[in-house]
């Protein structure tokens, strides 16, 4: 296990103990971490669903936000930044009990801005559930 992977596992472990909103991410599992790329998995459980039993759109946005930030932490700069813009396109539902894969890539990291892309897919079928783009300000 790389130190990058171990560091992110510590971050996820802290989320499971959080008393704030971050605790909703306590059920994600880190699959791999490489420079500018993070892959996580999560089973859709009842606490993750909306009234019709599918993955809640707000949780999808939270996954895009946080997993893309983890990908930024896995760069040489290692800066999480702050959100400037986030866009999510919802393409198909993830149902209760299904396993999803969340793959985040850093597309470009400049002096002050970083651009990331996140795909949420159904683990069994590979079907695209949602795709997000996240722009973050990295500071000076």
Curated annotation (Swiss-Prot):
Catalytic activity line of the entry: a fatty acyl-CoA + H2O = a fatty acid + CoA + H(+); decanoyl-CoA + H2O = decanoate + CoA + H(+); octanoyl-CoA + H2O = octanoate + CoA + H(+); butanoyl-CoA + H2O = butanoate + CoA + H(+)
Residues recorded with modification N-acetylthreonine: 2
Gene3D superfamilies: Hotdog Thioesterase
Keywords: Acetylation, Cytoplasm, Cytoskeleton, Hydrolase, Lipid metabolism, Metal-binding, Mitochondrion, Nucleus
EC number: 3.1.2.-, 3.1.2.2
InterPro entries documented for this protein: ACOT13 (IPR039298), HotDog_dom_sf (IPR029069), PAAI_dom (IPR003736), Thioestr_dom (IPR006683)
Protein localization: Cytoplasm, Cytosol; Mitochondrion; Nucleus; Cytoplasm, Cytoskeleton, Spindle
GO cellular component: cytosol; mitochondrial matrix; mitochondrion; nucleus; spindle
Keyword Lipid metabolism: yes
Consequence of substituting residue 65 to E/N: Reduced acyl-CoA hydrolase activity
Primary location recorded for the protein, binned into one broad class: cytoplasm
Molecular functions (GO terms): fatty acyl-CoA hydrolase activity; metal ion binding
Alphabetical GO biological process terms: lipid metabolic process; negative regulation of cold-induced thermogenesis; protein homotetramerization
Residues holding substrate: 50, 81
Binding-site residues, CoA: 46, 83, 90-95, 108-113, 137
Residues that bear N-acetylmethionine: 1
Similarity-based family: Belongs to the thioesterase PaaI family.
Quaternary data: Homotetramer. Interacts with PCTP.
Described function: Catalyzes the hydrolysis of acyl-CoAs into free fatty acids and coenzyme A (CoASH), regulating their respective intracellular levels. Has acyl-CoA thioesterase activity towards medium (C12) and long-chain (C18) fatty acyl-CoA substrates. Can also hydrolyze 3-hydroxyphenylacetyl-CoA and 3,4-dihydroxyphenylacetyl-CoA (in vitro). May play a role in controlling adaptive thermogenesis.
Protein name as annotated: Acyl-coenzyme A thioesterase 13
Source organism of the structure: Homo sapiens
């Amino acid at each position: 296990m790389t130190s990058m992977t171990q560091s992110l596992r510590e971050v996820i472990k802290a989320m499971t103990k959080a008393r704030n909103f971050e605790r909703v991410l306590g059920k994600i599992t880190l699959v791999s971490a490489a420079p500018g790329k993070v892959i996580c998995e999560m089973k859709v459980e009842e606490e993750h669903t909306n009234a019709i039993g599918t993955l809640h759109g707000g949780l999808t946005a939270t996954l895009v936000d946080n997993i893309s930030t983890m990908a930024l932490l896995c760069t040489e700069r290692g800066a999480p930044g702050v959100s400037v813009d986030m866009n999510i396109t919802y393409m198909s539902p993830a149902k209760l009990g299904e396993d999803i894969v969340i793959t985040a890539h850093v597309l470009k990291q400049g002096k002050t801005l970083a651009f990331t892309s996140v795909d949420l897919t159904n683990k069994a079928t590979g079907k695209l559930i949602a795709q997000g783009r996240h722009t973050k300000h990295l500071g000076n």
